[in-house]
Each structure stands twice: as C-alpha cells, then as structure tokens.
Amino acid sequence: GLTVDGQGADFIFHGRMLPLSLLRSENCTLRNFSIDFETPHIAQVKILESGEEGITFEPAAWVKCRINEKGFFEAYGEGWSSAPQGGIAFEEKTKRLVYRTSDLWCPMEGLKEISPRVYHAPQWKDARLKPGTVVALRTYYRPAPGIFLSNDKDTRLQNVKVHYAEGMGLLAQLCENITLDEFSVCLRGDKDPRYFTTQADATHFSSCRGKIDSRNGLYEGMMDDAINVHGTYLKIKQHLDDHTVIARYMHPQAYGFEWGVNGDEVQFVRSATMELTGGKNRVKEILPNDKDTVKGAKEYRITFAEPLDAEITDKEGFGIENLSWCPEVYFADNVIRNNRARGTLFSTPLKTVVERNLFDHTSG
C-alpha cells in the first residue's frame, strides 16, 4: 500500500491536463490536499445590462478573453481556447442557480467590445438574466477529470478537495472498494469569487464493484450530479446463435476498456421497458470484435455458458449488464448544493443506502 499525504498542499495546475491518476493499485490512500487550476476553462461573466437590444456583460478579472476570427467570444489559456455559447446562471448574492433557467443558450453573433473588457451580444436576449446575474459560460467538452482511478482495489480518499476540473472531479472505473471521507468538490469558502467548480459530475463511478462509501463531503457549483454510480451496458447488435452475440458500447464517450472477463455473471435488460428478460448467465468467452485488442474496441463477440432465452434477439433492443462489476453504495452526511442537473444517481442492483444528506438548491 501507498499513502500520498499532501499535508495541506494546494496544487495549482495550468493548461489542459489530468492532475492525478491512480492505476492498477491496491491499498492506496490519498489525503490532505486540494486540486485547482490557475485559469479554468469555464468563463465566468457578470450581466451588466439585459434588454431588447441584447445583453452586455463583463468577464471576471481572471478570465483571459478576446473576440475570435469568427466574431465570437473566446476564452483562452495555456494551450487551449474555447468559444462557449451556452451557460448556467447564478444569483449574484446567494450563488444559487437562477430559478427555472436550466441550460442557457448564449448566442454571440455580432459581439462587440464596447469598452475595455465589456462586451455587448446583440443576439443574446433573456429577460430572466437581470443585471448582476453571474453566468458560467461553458461548452460541454470534458476531456479530463481532477482525479482518475482505474483498476484499483481498496482505495481511500480523505480530506481531498477539487476546486476545479475540466471534467468530473473524481472519475473511477473498474475499481473495487472506494472510500471517500471528507472528499469535496467545492469553492474556496464564502469569499471565493468563483461561482462554479467542475465541468461535469463531482464524482462518477463506472463499472466498479465491492463497496463505494462516500460520506462527509461538500459538493457545490458543479455542472452535473454530485455522484453518479452506474454500470456500462452493451447493446446486442447481432444474434449469431443461441449462445453467441455481437454486442457494442453505445455511448460515444464509453468504450475502449475491458467490459468483462470469462466467468462474469450477466443479465439482460429490455431497453424499451427496462425489464429483465430471461435468467442470469455467465460469460464463457469474450473477444474484441472490431479491434485486435480491447484498447479502442467498441464491439465484443461474447459466448455465454448457457443458451440465451428465446426472447433475447437483435431485433428489439437488449442491453447486457455485467453483474460481476456492480457495487454496493453508502452515501451519507454529505451536502449537495447550487449545482446544475441532479443531486444523486444510483444505477446498481445491489444494496444502496442514502441517509442524512442535505440537498440545497439542486436544479435537476
């Protein structure tokens, strides 16, 4: 086992990068440090005027920005640039999301800089955005989490804070037994001039097993959920015989990693109704179908130990769930507030306990 104790260190990163990865480890602990970026990829602006002639806004002092060659607002930093035309609106004094605003469309056609660092967008019109409203201008690009865990066993994160990441705060896949104690995705206190934290989920667990234990955390200002726990389904694309199928990853951001191994227990889900169909089965053999190796593969050829139920075909739409890679979840004594989307998402057939959490102005 390895313990990384930051002793209160505040790690500030630059450009576009993945701050910390923990891969193929066992009995490791990360504790007592924080992660942030000098120049976030989200551009925070304040509404100065809003009316029939459009919106006038001023970027926050740390935002590096310009009008690009297409005439759009563009934020930039070391090795990156971004021209957002969407955003999330926050109340100036409370840092809560503006009621019933959801994802904003912020068109920048015809943008003009009417005085130093003050811009007028004539096509951006929204009566809900009163002067003083703070908008986090953003794209939906999320290339890197703050912390990435993969193929780890018995991992503990204690007193770790992620103040910003251009993706999830914590992304874990194919891990067994993860404990979060005082892990937070949060602002730097009440006087932090920022209104946002991460570009996506605060914590995200994909195809993990064992137990996910998350407690005593603060999750605020993120552009998605506080926690999302799920497996990764494959869709049956071809039914070759009563034991064999070709199945495919369907989400464009979820492929190229090991979906399962020989002996894994699976079940089948009818996509139209989310009902289980047939009995449980086991993988006898699984091979990448569209690549020579698992890396980069989107399709697998899977042979099952037992015959498939007659209802399971490639005509209707069936997903395969790997039961050997599903976790129990304990989520307790956390605060979730002032975020886009939902508070918590749990998609696991195993025991899930959610208790003593405070949900304060989650917008989804």
PLM feature spans:
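Repeat-solenoid scaffold signature
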Residues: 207-221
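Surface beta-strand/loop "capping" patches
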Residues: 27-32, 42-54, 236-261, 265
